[in-house]
Amino acid sequence: VTEKLPDFTDIHILPMFPYTSDDGFSVVDYLQINPDFGDWSDVENLAQERRLMFDFVCNHLSKSSKWFQKFLTEDENFKNAFISFDENFDSSKTTRPRTSPLFTEIDGKKVWTTFSADQVDTNAHDPKMLARLTEVLLEYVARGASSIRLDAIGFLWKQSGTTSMHLPQTHEVIKLWRTLLDTLAPNVQIITETNVPHADNISYFGKGTDEANMVYQFPLPPLVLHSFISGNSSALTNWAKTIKPVSDSATYFNFLASHDGIGLRPVEDILSNKERDEIAEEVLKNGGKVSYKNNPDGSQSPYELNINYLSALGSAEKLLAAHAILLSFLGVPAIYYHSIFGSRNDQKAVQETGIARRINREKLDKSKLYAELENNPERKQIYEKLSQLLKVRKNERAFNPYGNQEILDFGERVFALKREYGKKNLVSIINISDEIVTLSLSGLDIITQTVFSGTLNPYQYVWISLD
């Protein structure tokens, strides 16, 4: 981190706890570090160098966890810690992100399992369990977390006859945790992970001051990908016009790639079925995998794309231009480590495990990576140019995550926006097409420190100072 990523202020550590499945998201013990990774002293040492984001997988635990084992043995303090099957509970409308059974029988007890038979949902209805979860949250802060990512938080509260998704009680739990953190650790931020349509996603801002400090900008990855595949920025531009500043204490968590796939649900109301199908076709062509959902009429629709973002786009030039969009956008940008290091699809991992998401979860060997950053032209180009962009952005106050943003319309081959904070102003322009574009605009490009005369080469990007 110190050697190769000096310009990152924060690091998101994916689940670092003992686990039994789902690459870490089936946690056995919230408060132990997986010995394969080190121990708490390693985490605390890293927290001295960078701000850290911890994952709080509060919706579910591994069936091998001590808490669940105590539930199975009917320990008095854990008898309601998880959700048992109740024939009077109407779960017919429950939102399902998986095709696996909603209830799983484990040692004679049928329990709620949203994501898999190994991941048992916690019962936030139980005051004792909610108190335990709250203690975990506060322990993470004590251990050095600067941000807490609430994984799958939208599923937390279950209620008969509802979707058991985004329920008011879930929002109340987040408000409780936000109040505690604002009082006890005001510099710690809550980030909600809800990969759902945009209106539902931004509901986790609450009033802008009482729930999430940041929400994931889930429409951004598929919309940017669509722009480069089609050579047309219209959908991205029109959606971006709806994104406004939230408050002085809340903003967007922007990203293009992550350990998960690229979700298409967030753009169901933004892109047409045909446009989403076209993205899926391009992903398949570029070696990726597509997960489909069944529709009521018997048809299928793509809902998640499993592919490395560089492989999806096809070239280093497109990846760099895409990240110029990411780094310009209102909010806090987050770059997946495989993106800055120029990784491509890990087909071997998919073939060996049969798990589609492994295509973008390659575990890199440090010495091999360091050698390739020098000897592999694509890795070297991406790493050096993205690192340069980060250095420039770091010193530009107009990119303040709580500043203003105005989307500009320079035609469908370009995505452009104006960023403003205080007296600092700049215009970011990205050519998302394979054509030369000429604009009636000139000024100093702060990336290259040269005068931009109005001509953009294919996939070229500029940040024009207006000061």
Question: What spans do the regions from the language model cover?
Answer:
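Active-site and adjacent substrate-binding regions of carbohydrate-active enzymes
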Residues: 1-440, 454-467
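Solvent-exposed beta-hairpin/edge-strand motifs
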Residues: 442-451
